[in-house]
């Protein structure tokens, strides 16, 4: 199986499980590859790290939730695996150049 196909399959699996605790250890165990080899293969195929991919997917899901629901920001953060609303807000702001609250209200 090609590296491209392996990573495509892993991305599909990650996307299905994005609301669960995911990190390199979990994904490496699922893939059957070492952490080092998986990171190298993932970066070669996608041009980003596995951690960056997971973080971006979670933030995109959060952005959709903020746009389409009135759910509390705290609940969105917790559902996406962040340990606190403050951590979530800091990471969200780094990605979108505004806080989750500003993002929700400026649409």
UniProtKB/Swiss-Prot annotation:
Record's Gene3D superfamilies?
Answer: Homeodomain-like
User: What are the GO MF terms of this UniProt record?
Assistant: bacterial-type RNA polymerase holo enzyme binding; cis-regulatory region sequence-specific DNA binding; DNA-binding transcription factor activity; sequence-specific DNA binding
Induction remark:
By paraquat.
Q: Name one GO cellular component term.
A: cytosol
Location of the protein in the cell: Cytoplasm
GO biological process: any one?
regulation of DNA-templated transcription
Residues of the HTH araC/xylS-type domain: 8-106
Q: Which residues bind DNA?
A: 25-46, 73-96
InterPro entries xref list: Homeodomain-like_sf, HTH_AraC, HTH_AraC-typ_CS, MarA-like, Tscrpt_reg_AraC-type_HTH
Which keywords has UniProt assigned to this entry? Activator, Cytoplasm, DNA-binding, Transcription, Transcription regulation
What PANTHER family would the database entry show? REGULATORY PROTEIN SOXS, RIGHT ORIGIN-BINDING PROTEIN
Q: What does this protein do?
A: Transcriptional activator of the superoxide response regulon of E.coli that includes at least 10 genes such as sodA, nfo, zwf and micF. Binds the DNA sequence 5'-GCACN(7)CAA-3'. It also facilitates the subsequent binding of RNA polymerase to the micF and the nfo promoters.
Q: Mind telling me what this protein is named?
A: Regulatory protein SoxS
Organism equals Escherichia coli (strain K12)
